[in-house]
């Protein structure tokens, strides 16, 4: 399974990757991006199974990256990760086509549930 983890914080990316590697008993190919533009470019190159995407990033924020990824591939599975998921943001990402969302700090049980929904 190819997974793209996008966050401007290297520590946040490492936490998501650590959670995935510890809790998922499947072969994972994990790629990293540090902003929304990198995520979009990398998505087009590797066509990951799922994308974990932070909302607040420089260059291209998560909202715009989500929108552009969905324009490129309407079937893309994008999971929004954010410390501050307000109702307004939640409504917006769901309208843009987010597959699911995870609140920071990362809950490994939630991550497992999301990956099970892919099958």
Regions found by a protein language model. Name each.
Residues 10-31:
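Two-component/phosphorelay signaling modules centered on CheY-like receiver
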Residues 104:
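A Lys-centered signature of the CheY-like receiver
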């Amino acid at each position: 399974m190819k997974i793209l983890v996008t966050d401007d914080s290297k520590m946040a990316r490492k936490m998501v990757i650590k959670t995935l590697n510890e809790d998922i008993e499947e072969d994972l190919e994990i790629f990293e991006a540090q902003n929304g533009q990198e995520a979009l470019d990398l998505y087009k190159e590797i066509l990951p199974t799922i994308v974990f995407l932070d909302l607040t990033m420089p260059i291209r924020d998560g909202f715009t990256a989500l929108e552009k990824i969905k324009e490129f591939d309407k079937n893309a599975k994008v999971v929004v990760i954010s410390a501050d998921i307000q109702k307004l943001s939640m409504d917006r990402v769901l309208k843009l086509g987010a597959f699911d969302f995870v609140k920071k700090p990362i809950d490994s049980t939630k991550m497992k549930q999301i990956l099970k929904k892919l099958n």
